[in-house]
Amino acid sequence: MKKIKVRYAPSPTGFLHIGNARTALFNYLFAKQNQGEFIIRIEDTDFSRNVEGGEASQLKNLRWLGIDWSEGPDIQGPFGPYRQSERLAIYQKYAQKLLDQDLAYKEFQEGHTTFAIRFRVPTNQTFAFDDLIRGKLTFQSQEIEDFIILKSNGYPSYNFAVVIDDHLMQISHIFRGEEHITNTPKQIMIYQAFQWHLPQFAHMTLILNENKKKLSKRDANIMQFIEQYEKLGYLPQALFNFLSLLGFSPLSQTEILSPQELINLFDVARLNKAPAMFDKTKLDYLNNQHLRKLLPEVIASFILQKKYLALTTAPTNYKEWMTKFVALFQDRMHYMQQITDFYQLFFQSTPFLSQEATHFLQTNPQTTLILKTFYNVFDVIVFEKDVIANSIKQVTTQNDFAKKTLFMALRIGTTCKMHGPSIALLLELLGKKQVLKNLSYVLEQAQKF
């Protein structure tokens, strides 16, 4: 059996787009699942679209996602070069072979000596192939006019170069977007003209936006580049997980899957024909689930490295403080930069009460006494989580306050919020000075009623 070998062949037009990342990922999953090879080739012959640094950016983001390759422009290999701009002599050689067999012809521009080369489309022929996702697809040659394979500047057309490269690089399977379906009959013609064996094609479903329209780079409300997610602190394994599910339904009881689990589960028979929906809420959920699996100190190290939280005065033992802070909010975190939102929510220097909190103070006359009690207790204790928790327990058991009222008054009084995470650890991180300041402010407001 021929060894399975697939490729991802981007143009260096900028950052790695989520659609292209999905294409790379499906090729990678298929190769790994079948102990095959995954390679990278750069299609850079359209210089007007190339962006400086685009190639390096794409490769960096693929590696960040957890995708590796055995051949490519950065590591070379036995079938290079791996940039189309460095393979022009190869394309010209094969174009000449078609000219020699009268399977192509020169087309001169009027008044010029330069010419393009067009492929002669066979007349009255049917071209069919078995798509691994969509089944048998058929095209008639009369629907296609003679097409350019080599431009007058000596550069190949996409459909010509891709066939030459895929054959010479021994590509066995091609996973790509459904927009390439119409290119396939032209490519089949070229394969047949050279009497080369066809690779197997799999045309993946479209990715739709929330309005069920094809995802476009003009969709400003959707972040569309992998680098944007990396900068916000999404985990690569979570993006890997999310992108893998855009058009693939694994045979699994859970959608929260590691890269290795997705490799093991990947099955072409379970690739969908129906369009996939880009659901940001689902991505946030998956990232949250992957974040929950990490130790707080791992997330804390990343947050410190990325400098998401730029504090004017950092707490003593900042990494230890950050680890505790992460532990407090880890279950609520959709991405790591969100730590700044949690900090701003609770660690504000100027206390402020919401309308809801103010209403609670107005309608619960016990609040003032509860707040005074906690102020007096917190003023004299060592401000550590276990000591704080024990002090709260003592106030609860030694006084006749209604429990629900007591705990709500405690949370409002110490944090100026109606809701929040574990109170004892939160108060330790806020620090005694801020907690007493909050209590004084809320007491002052409560005494007005």
Swiss-Prot record:
- Location relative to the cell: Cytoplasm
Where along the sequence does the record place the motif called 'KMSKS' region?
214-218
Source species, domain of life: Bacteria
GO cellular component labels: cytosol
Q: Which residues are recorded as binding ATP?
A: 217
Q: Which reaction does it catalyse?
A: tRNA(Glu) + L-glutamate + ATP = L-glutamyl-tRNA(Glu) + AMP + diphosphate
One GO biological-process annotation of the entry reads: glutamyl-tRNA aminoacylation
Q: Which segment of this protein is annotated as the motif 'HIGH' region?
A: 10-20
Cross-referenced InterPro entries, in alphabetical order? aa-tRNA-synth_I_cd-bd, aa-tRNA-synth_I_codon-bd_sub2, aa-tRNA-synth_I_CS, aa_tRNA-synth_I_cd-bd_sf, Glu-tRNA-ligase_bac/mito, Glu/Gln-tRNA-synth, Glu/Gln-tRNA-synth_Ib_cat-dom, GluQ/Sye
Instruction: Establish whether keyword ATP-binding is in the entry.
Output: yes
What is this protein's function? Catalyzes the attachment of glutamate to tRNA(Glu) in a two-step reaction: glutamate is first activated by ATP to form Glu-AMP and then transferred to the acceptor end of tRNA(Glu).
Subunit: Monomer.
Q: State the name under which the record lists this protein.
A: Glutamate--tRNA ligase
Classification from the root reads: Bacteria, Bacillati, Mycoplasmatota, Mollicutes, Acholeplasmatales
